[in-house]
Every structure is written in structure tokens, then in C-alpha cells.
Amino acid sequence: MIQKETNLVVADNSGAKKVRCIHVFGGTGRRYASLGDQVIVSVKTAVPGGIVKKKDVCKAVVVRAVKESRRKDGSYIRFDENAVVILNAQGEPRGTRIFGPVARELRDKRYMKIVSLAPEVL
């Protein structure tokens, strides 16, 4: 359950380490984002020499969320942190590596590049 002002961890090597959500895509009244949803984020901390810098505004997709998400088979998936992957204008990841597991819901939402780069899909 990601909303405006939520602090997030970045799960790729784009150069950003921590970001803050500033908008949730999906209509005017949409308040929350869950696994596989796109958000706009502002970079709060970044590594020197990275692709993205502090204060940059980027698109990102949620790959891990603390709030449990119900699946079609009745099971639930929940993670220990809220994490995103930074995207470019075409919707592809800006980094070349993904750190940590990602949710299977990303495959349903057509983020195949992220799923293929991830070390584990839960």
C-alpha cells in the first residue's frame, strides 16, 4: 500500500538508493499503489556517479510491498520492505541489475525485463 509521501528503497543499480513517492498512476482519485503499479518518485539519496541523481523525478514500478497482496489461488504475498525499480520513458528498467526477490505479479503486468533480471521471483 504505497501512497504519496511513502519512502521507498530502490531495488536496482540505477544509482538511487532511497526515493519518495510523489504520485500514484491510475486516475485522479487513486490513493494507493500495490505490486506492479507505476508511481512517480523523487530521488532522496543517490550514489555518486550513478545514472540518476538526487532530486531527479522518475517513473518507477513497485516490486515489493509490506502490505500483503491476495493472489487468485487464495494465498497472500508480503515482503519486509517497500521497494521499486526505476523506469525510463519506455517503461524499461534504467539499471542493469535487480537486487532481491520480486513478486510474480510483475509477469502478469508485462514487466518481463524486470522478471528476467531478478534473482528470484516469488
Swiss-Prot record:
The keyword Ribosomal protein applies. Keywords: Ribonucleoprotein, Ribosomal protein, RNA-binding, rRNA-binding. It comes from the Bacteria. One of its GO terms (biological process) is translation. Transmembrane segments: none annotated. The keyword Ion transport does not apply. InterPro entries: Ribosomal_uL14 (IPR000218), Ribosomal_uL14_bac-type (IPR005745), Ribosomal_uL14_CS (IPR019972), Ribosomal_uL14_sf (IPR036853). One of its GO terms (cellular component) is cytosolic large ribosomal subunit. Binds to 23S rRNA. Forms part of two intersubunit bridges in the 70S ribosome. Part of the 50S ribosomal subunit. Forms a cluster with proteins L3 and L19. In the 70S ribosome, L14 and L19 interact and together make contacts with the 16S rRNA in bridges B5 and B8. Belongs to the universal ribosomal protein uL14 family. This is Large ribosomal subunit protein uL14. It comes from Chlorobium chlorochromatii (strain CaD3).
